[in-house]
UniProtKB/Swiss-Prot annotation:
Keyword annotations of the record: Glycoprotein, Secreted, Signal
Annotated S-S bridges: none
CDD domains for the chain: Four-jointed-like_C (cd10468)
Location of this chain's protein in the cell: Secreted
Principal location listed in the UniProt entry: secreted
DNA damage found in the keyword field: no
Designated name of the protein: Four-jointed box protein 1
A Gene Ontology cellular-component term: extracellular space
GO term, biological process aspect, one: cell-cell signaling
Natural source organism: Xiphophorus maculatus (Southern platyfish)
Signal sequence annotation: 1-18
Alphabetized InterPro entries for the sequence: FJX1/FJ
Function as written in the Swiss-Prot or TrEMBL entry: May act as an inhibitor of dendrite extension and branching.
Annotated glycosylation sites: 81, 244, 270
Encoding gene (name): fjx1
Length: 427
């Protein structure tokens, strides 16, 4: 009887803790969405998130998981040339390569021919219409400017309370991420460079900065930093603030009532070019979130279906869209480091989402195949990270364990692609 009472008490305690996490997550999420939709002082509207979201956020509770031991790798690797001299610096607006030339094509009807080639790859004509969102040259120029530009104002407006919207001296803005723990900043940063390695250009430019109230970059907001109780010398990330973005609802082929994004679907023939281009970007997003084990986007929605059957009908977490329909992947703090640490909790959902897709971008899959064949994802990511980011040593890199997890996920993704190819190659 005493043992039964003890077990009952333990169950009640767990339920109470779960309820607290649920309520706190919902309240914090509503506050984040409210701040993201509020007006900024210059009259513009900050749209780094939908204005309303009734689904529960699971990421907040998971941040209570103890921080895993991280390794700082020593030594410098040979530099890679990632720069491009042409760039537009200092603009608040969203830039793409060749956007004006291709916008009419995106709005027009579908060309003659099936949108899928070789069984499982999006057609070349679709690839040609989809622009590069943030070019290497543009991103490099923005990072160079953001490393030295003085910050003259910090204010709420970038989601989580611990994040701030920074205004530079020239009037441009960036979101400053001060993580609850270093995993968040490290995860977001390494996720950004993994995207570069894969040729996925949907992530806004990112740079690291070290807080120092006496430095030229931070001296003007020293009082604000002290009020925020940010630690001196902490490494924070700055990502370009993009205006005029809207929320994105999960497309019908990827919802629970559908069979998935498969090349055999007849509905492709009835889609406009713009709709097909969005689906193409979704296929990249799903591949990317699988590799990074990011649970705070579509996977979170899938998990929430247990108590919220309409979650897929609302805006997806941390995913926004430009007026031209180009997707922007934001707030990637759950990727790689934290995502790998809690992988056992989420892996069945990651697998379920990946299994729903058998159409891929050929360029992305070529890079995945190369990383699978060479088995050097750790080395190449580290080289790119160190070559591009002067503060890489201070922030650190993936542990050997997590680097092995990344390579394993690349291998599993490649295996999934080959299974899709075997199944649909005759179409």
């Amino acid at each position: 009887m005493r043992a039964l009472s003890a077990n009952l008490f333990a169950v009640l305690l767990m339920c109470a803790l779960a309820s607290v996490f649920y309520v706190w997550s919902a309240l914090e999420n509503r506050l984040e969405r409210h701040k993201r939709g509020s007006s900024v002082p210059d009259g513009g509207s900050f749209h780094q998130g939908p204005s309303e979201d009734h689904s529960a956020k699971t990421f907040r509770a998971l941040l209570a998981v103890p921080v895993a031991q991280r390794q700082n790798s020593a030594g410098r690797s040979k530099a890679q040339n990632l720069t491009n001299p042409s760039a537009f610096v200092g603009s608040r607006d969203y830039h793409v390569n060749g956007d004006d030339e291709r916008s009419a094509q995106r709005e027009g009807p579908v060309k003659l021919g099936y949108p899928v080639d070789d069984g499982i790859f999006w057609s070349n004509w679709l690839e040609d219409v989809l622009p590069v969102r943030f070019t290497e040259g543009y991103a490099e120029a923005w990072r160079s400017k953001a490393r030295t530009s003085p910050v003259v104002k910090l204010e709420p407006g970038c989601g989580r309370i611990s994040n701030q919207l920074a205004t530079f001296a020239d009037g441009t803005k960036a979101c400053v991420r001060y993580g609850i723990n270093a995993d968040q900043v490290q995860g977001e940063t390494l996720t950004y460079y993994l995207a570069s390695l894969l040729g996925i250009t949907n992530l806004p430019p990112l740079v690291l900065s070290q807080l120092n109230g006496d430095s030229a970059q931070w001296v003007a907001v020293r009082t604000r930093i002290n009020n925020l109780q940010w630690s001196d010398r902490a490494v924070v990330s700055l990502t370009e603030w993009i205006s005029n973005l809207t929320g994105v609802v999960t497309p019908a082929p990827l919802r629970q009532e559908s069979s998935g994004l498969l090349p055999a679907l007849r509905c492709f023939e009835n889609k406009t070019t713009a709709e097909l281009l969005e689906l193409m970007q979704w296929s990249d997003l799903i591949v990317f979130d699988y590799l990074t084990a990011n649970f705070d986007r579509l996977v979170s929605n899938l998990f929430s279906l247990q108590w919220d059957p309409h979650v897929m009908e609302r805006d997806t977490n941390n995913l926004l869209k430009t007026p031209h329909g180009d997707l922007v992947f934001i707030d990637n703090e759950a990727g790689l480091v934290h995502g790998f640490r809690v992988l056992n909790m989420w892996e069945k959902y990651h697998h379920s989402v990946l299994s729903s897709v058998c159409v891929f971008r050929k360029r992305t899959m070529q890079r995945v195949a190369e990383l699978h064949r060479r088995r050097d994802s750790r080395q190449r990511l580290l080289e790119l990270y160190r070559d591009s980011e002067p503060l890489s040593q201070e922030l650190g890199f993936l542990s050997d364990e997590h680097a092995a997890v990344l390579q394993d996920r690349i291998d599993q993704l490649y295996k999934h692609i080959m299974q899709c190819k075997e199944k649909y190659n005759q179409l």
